[in-house]
Structures are given as structure tokens and as C-alpha cells.
Swiss-Prot record:
<dbReference type="InterPro" id="IPR020058">
    <property type="entry name" value="Glu/Gln-tRNA-synth_Ib_cat-dom"/>
</dbReference>
<feature type="binding site">
    <location>
        <begin position="285"/>
        <end position="286"/>
    </location>
    <ligand>
        <name>ATP</name>
    </ligand>
</feature>
<dbReference type="GO" id="GO:0005829">
    <property type="term" value="C:cytosol"/>
</dbReference>
<dbReference type="InterPro" id="IPR014729">
    <property type="entry name" value="Rossmann-like_a/b/a_fold"/>
</dbReference>
<dbReference type="Pfam" id="PF03950">
    <property type="entry name" value="tRNA-synt_1c_C"/>
</dbReference>
<dbReference type="GO" id="GO:0006425">
    <property type="term" value="P:glutaminyl-tRNA aminoacylation"/>
</dbReference>
<dbReference type="InterPro" id="IPR011035">
    <property type="entry name" value="Ribosomal_bL25/Gln-tRNA_synth"/>
</dbReference>
<dbReference type="GO" id="GO:0004819">
    <property type="term" value="F:glutamine-tRNA ligase activity"/>
</dbReference>
<feature type="binding site">
    <location>
        <begin position="293"/>
        <end position="295"/>
    </location>
    <ligand>
        <name>ATP</name>
    </ligand>
</feature>
<protein>
    <recommendedName>
        <fullName>Glutamine--tRNA ligase</fullName>
        <ecNumber>6.1.1.18</ecNumber>
    </recommendedName>
</protein>
<dbReference type="GO" id="GO:0005524">
    <property type="term" value="F:ATP binding"/>
</dbReference>
<dbReference type="InterPro" id="IPR050132">
    <property type="entry name" value="Gln/Glu-tRNA_Ligase"/>
</dbReference>
<dbReference type="InterPro" id="IPR020056">
    <property type="entry name" value="Rbsml_bL25/Gln-tRNA_synth_N"/>
</dbReference>
<dbReference type="GO" id="GO:0006424">
    <property type="term" value="P:glutamyl-tRNA aminoacylation"/>
</dbReference>
<keyword id="KW-0547">Nucleotide-binding</keyword>
<comment type="similarity">
    <text>Belongs to the class-I aminoacyl-tRNA synthetase family.</text>
</comment>
<dbReference type="InterPro" id="IPR000924">
    <property type="entry name" value="Glu/Gln-tRNA-synth"/>
</dbReference>
Length: 579
């Protein structure tokens, strides 16, 4: 992809968070003339809502300041990575409304990393260690006790270079040796206690095949990847704050800016020379109640078939949220409202739902659908009576136009809109009572039909002929208005009523001996058969509607068709979880 300026999907008012203030100061002082950021996910799973915050920040920041943002796939652990995940990541970024200046892979820089590691060895900053993983843990020490030097720490430069070259040649089995940095085994920051820079893994790589039996560790590859790409502001969440000293150590000791010869493999590949010294800046991660965002736990939900795959609309993956009906605009609005800070906090899920309601209230056309149908026969209309009514597609926006809705003698209405024995304050249908049928006139119930078990199966009533649209009687006051669909014309649809996957605010809380599995909400998905007006059935996959008086729904991206409509409830009209 050609190097183009990042384009933000929104043009918000100037934001005042601490990261943007740093960027403004860096530009004003002349420290940087062009801002460069990157979004560097590992392609070992699907992105979740927490990644949306990072995406919007990385790409949005570059766009706001006329800079560039790369998408870099951190493919340094091939045993857990898959091209399927890499493709999904790219799809998710574009879905959110962003595009990258360049698509890069950490594997593009494997030769640079190798040369950098050799430089560290020559400079006396790295050594090949023969300790096993368990022995390394024993030597590392604790938070209160310093670590001990590896017995292999004082190998000569020549021996280290030879062993590292033989590691590269594939002479040794997995786990036999590592390349470690020489930093400080007494440091209070355990990340600085001679961390591993390379490990042996005889695993085929998706991009490089079997060319490399050794792979760089995350901290080494991540910091140098930023330096290689000339990233000015490397943004990450607070859990990496303790890694920043190691990040800076790698950048400073390798010094790609001062040693351009290390970048020759990039030039050989036709990649530009852009090296610079990056600055890591940490911000709070996104934590939302009623969710889990651990990749391990999300994977378990899928593998244990507790959900219907990574794009299950109850999942907090971007693929799942998209299938649920969440929009890019709602996601960006949510990130903007959450804001950027250094203080971890728990965001209420209702904030996310509110952003979706706000977006769809403006963006979604209206349709009528009946979720739990009850038949209403208007006996004063002739058998076979059918007419066409004109309905506005959006009560607040004339640009949405109008549509034709068939009206007939037999209708489906919501079962919950009738009460044989109404509670106090009831404003819908009752025996002998009147109600306004949305856009059609005023109806009265005269007879309740029951089956042998005493269940209500139908209502028989009367439509006031003087209350039809355009007539003076149409303005007659009645207690309420209900929606309906014509029984003869409506299309039967599968309607999936989704709700929050977990029933408690903190499903990660295991203080009572329970796990997140114990808090799964049994009502998180209900499949019902209902009826939608004909124009709704013709929706394209992922087309959103407000089903009047019911909620916001989206045509399912996988299963929906005009002949077999499937709609997912994205969000209710009001917060059903409000306390």
C-alpha cells in the first residue's frame, strides 16, 4: 500500500488529553515535523473492543496531526499465528473507518533484528545462555531478592557470536539456548534482569517458511520495529509501563539511527530507510463491565462452544460486535467518550449501548416487526380487504423518503400489547378498549378467542372508518398507539434477541470460588419466530433498522436472505439493565 496520510473517519473538536498535548509540544518545538504512529497487533486471535480504543487512538492521532500510521502485524511467534487472523485484523481496521500508510510485518525485519543482536554481542551487551527456562526462573530472583548472574554470562564475544550463528543455523533443539541481554540482575524492575532477546523455535513461519529456527522476543522486536519504521510516538497500554526501560535500552544500545548499515536488509527488499528514535507512551486500557477481554478466556468460550464462534453477536470481538449491529460510528463515538488517561477505570456497558442508540436513532430507517405475534381480525372490513399505506422511513429525517406498507383485514400485533385483565396504568389494548393502529386508524377489541387450554389465540375487533389517515376522526384521542403487520403480506423471520453475555458486572471476579463460566447469562440469546413487513425482508445483510417500539435490529451478515430473513437485536430502545 502506498504511503498516504492517515484519514480519520471523524472531525471532532480539538481534544485535550495528555497524549495529544505531548504531540502538540513535539511539533511546536520542532522535535518532529511529521507524526508517525503504528497499530501492532499479533495475528493470533480476533481483535476485541479493547483494541478499538488503540486503533482509534493510533490512526486518529496520526490523522488529526497530518501524520502517518502503519499497521504492523507482530508475527514473531509463528506457533500461535494464522493468516485468518491477519486478514480479520485488516478487515476490522478498515471497518472502523481507517486505512494504513503501510502494511508491515515484524518478519519483514528479521534480518535487521539478527544484525542488531550481533551488534549487541560485539558491544558486550548480550550473551548466549544455556540455562533452561526453569533455571532462568530460579536465577531471576524475586521482587524482594536480587537475581543471580547466569554462569554463561561471561562468555567471550567470539564464543557468543559463534553460538548465536549456530543457533541461527538450526544446530540446537528448541529451548537449548537463548540470547539474553546483559543489563542488571539486581534491578528492582524484573524486566531488566538479563531478559531473553531470542529463543530457539523450529516452527514454520507463515511468511518466511523454515528460514528461521530462532525468533526475537516481543520486547526486542517491538522496540526495534518502532525504530525501523521511524515511529515518533509508540502508544501502548499501562501494563507495558514497566517494559519501557527495556524498550529504551534496546533502542539506545542498538542505535539504528547511528548505525544505518544495520538497515541494509530493508534497502535490499526495497523498503525505505526511516529509522528514528521512538518514544513509548502508556495510556489506560479499556475495561468494560459485564465483559471479559482476556484472549485466553475468549478462546475458551469459543473452544468450549459456550458461544457460536468468534463472530457470535454476544462476543466482544470486533467481528462479533459488527455482526450484532454495532456501527463504526458508534464505536468511534464510544472511544471518544471514554477518553484517554493514565487512570484505569471500569466503563459501564450502557455507555457503549448508548452510543449505538444515538447513532442508529439518526442512521436507521424505521420498519414494523412483530416479535410475539397475536392475530387481530378487523371484522368490519370485507374478506380479502387489502390497501397500501404510505409510511415515513424516518420521523426525524425526510431525506429517508417513504415506503408502501400493506394493510389488511387480518393483522399481527404484539401479544404483550393486549391484556385481558389490565394492570393499573395500562395504555394498550383491552376488551372493549380502543387503540391507535400505527398509521392505519383506531381499532377496538370486541371478542377474545381462546383455545381449549384457555390460551388467547386471536382477537376480533372493529376499525373505526372515520379514523383513517387524513380523516378528521384520525386525530381522536386514545390512550396509546401500537404497531402491526399485515398477516397476509408479512414475511416470517427468525429474530435473535441478544443480550449481555454475562449476568454480573465483574465476571472476572473469582473471589467467591467461581469463574466467568459461572456467570454466563442464560438469557443472552433467544431465538423467536416473528413477522416483518415486506420491505424489511428485502434488507441487505448488515442493514440496520429500528423496529418500531421494539429496538434496533440488523440483518444477519451470515444467515439473512429475502426468503429467510434473520435479524439480530443490536440494542433495546432503552437501557433494560438500568438500576
Amino acid at each position: 500500500m502506498s504511503e498516504t496520510l492517515a484519514t480519520d473517519a471523524t472531525t471532532p473538536a480539538e481534544k485535550k488529553d495528555f497524549i495529544r498535548q505531548i504531540v502538540r509540544e513535539d511539533l511546536a518545538s520542532g522535535k518532529h515535523t511529521v507524526i508517525r504512529t503504528r497499530f501492532p497487533p499479533e495475528p493470533n486471535g480476533y481483535l476485541h473492543i479493547g483494541h478499538a480504543k488503540a486503533i482509534c487512538l493510533d490512526f486518529g492521532l496520526a490523522a488529526e496531526f497530518g501524520g502517518l500510521c502503519n499497521l504492523r502485524l507482530d508475527d514473531t511467534n509463528p506457533a500461535k499465528e494464522d493468516p485468518e487472523f491477519a486478514a480479520a485484523i485488516q478487515d476490522d481496521v478498515r471497518w472502523l473507518g481507517y486505512d494504513w500508510a503501510q502494511l508491515r510485518h515484524a518478519s519483514d525485519y528479521f534480518e535487521v533484528y539478527y544484525l542488531a543482536a550481533q551488534k549487541l554481542i560485539r558491544d558486550g551487551h548480550a550473551f548466549v545462555c544455556d540455562l533452561s527456562a526453569e533455571q532462568v526462573r530460579q536465577y531471576r530472583g524475586t521482587l524482594t531478592e536480587p537475581g543471580r548472574h547466569s554462569p554463561f554470562r561471561e562468555r567471550s564475544v567470539e564464543e557468543n557470536l559463534d553460538l548465536f550463528q549456530r543457533m541461527r543455523a538450526g544446530e540446537f533443539p528448541d529451548g537449548a539456548r537463548t540470547l539474553r541481554a546483559k543489563i542488571d540482575m539486581a534491578s528492582g524492575n524484573i524486566n531488566l534482569r538479563d531478559p531473553a532477546l531470542y529463543r530457539i523455535k523450529h516452527v514454520e513461519h507463515q511468511n518466511t517458511g523454515n528460514a528461521w529456527p530462532i525468533y526475537p522476543m516481543y520486547d526486542f522486536a517491538h522496540s526495534l520495529g518502532d525504530a525501523v519504521e521511524g515511529i515518533t510516538h509508540s502508544l501502548c497500554t499501562l501494563e507495558f509501563e514497566d517494559h519501557r526501560p527495556l524498550y529504551d535500552w534496546c533502542v539506545d544500545k542498538v542505535d539504528l539511527v547511528g548505525h544505518p548499515e544495520l538497515l541494509q536488509p530493508l534497502l535490499d527488499k526495497g523498503l525505505p530507510r526511516e529509522a528514528a528514535k521512538p518514544r513509548q507512551i502508556e495510556f489506560s486500557r479499556l475495561n468494560i463491565n459485564y465483559t471479559v477481554m482476556s484472549k485466553r478466556k475468549l478462546t475458551a468460550l469459543v473452544e468450549e462452544q459456550l458461544v457460536d464462534g468468534w463472530d457470535d453477536p454476544r462476543m466482544y470481538t470486533l467481528q462479533g460486535l459488527r455482526r450484532r449491529g454495532y456501527t463504526p460510528a458508534a464505536m468511534r463515538l464510544f472511544v471518544e467518550r471514554v477518553g484517554i488517561s493514565k487512570q484505569n477505570s471500569l466503563i459501564d456497558f450502557s455507555v457503549l449501548e448508548g452510543c449505538l442508540r444515538e447513532d442508529l436513532d439518526a442512521a436507521a430507517a424505521r420498519r414494523m416487526a412483530v416479535i410475539d405475534p397475536l392475530k387481530l381480525v378487523l371484522t368490519n372490513l370485507p374478506e380479502g380487504h387489502t390497501e397500501t399505506l404510505q409510511f415515513s422511513n424516518h420521523p426525524k429525517d425526510e431525506s429517508f423518503g417513504t415506503r408502501e406498507v400493506p394493510f389488511a383485514r387480518v393483522l399481527w400485533i404484539e401479544r404483550e400489547d393486549f391484556a385481558e385483565v389490565p394492570p393499573k396504568g395500562w395504555k394498550r389494548l383491552v376488551p372493549g378498549g380502543e387503540i391507535r393502529l400505527r398509521g392505519a386508524g383506531i381499532a377496538r377489541v370486541d371478542e377474545v378467542i381462546k383455545n381449549a387450554d384457555g390460551d388467547i389465540v386471536a382477537l376480533r375487533g372493529w376499525l373505526d372508518p372515520e379514523s383513517r389517515p387524513g380523516m378528521e376522526g384520525a386525530n381522536r384521542k386514545v390512550k396509546g398507539t401500537i404497531h402491526w403487520v399485515s398477516a397476509a403480506h408479512a414475511v416470517e423471520a427468525e429474530i435473535r434477541l441478544y443480550d449481555r453475555l454475562f449476568s454480573v458486572e465483574k465476571p472476572d471476579d473469582e473471589s467467591e470460588g467461581k469463574t466467568y463460566r459461572d456467570y454466563l447469562n442464560p438469557e443472552s440469546k433467544r431465538n423467536v419466530r416473528g413477522y416483518v413487513e415486506p420491505s424489511a425482508a428485502l434488507a441487505a445483510p448488515e442493514q440496520a433498522f429500528q423496529f418500531e417500539r421494539t429496538g434496533y435490529f440488523v440483518a444477519d451478515s451470515r444467515d439473512h436472505s429475502a426468503s429467510t430473513p434473520v435479524f439480530n437485536r443490536s440494542v433495546t430502545l432503552r437501557d433494560a439493565w438500568a438500576k
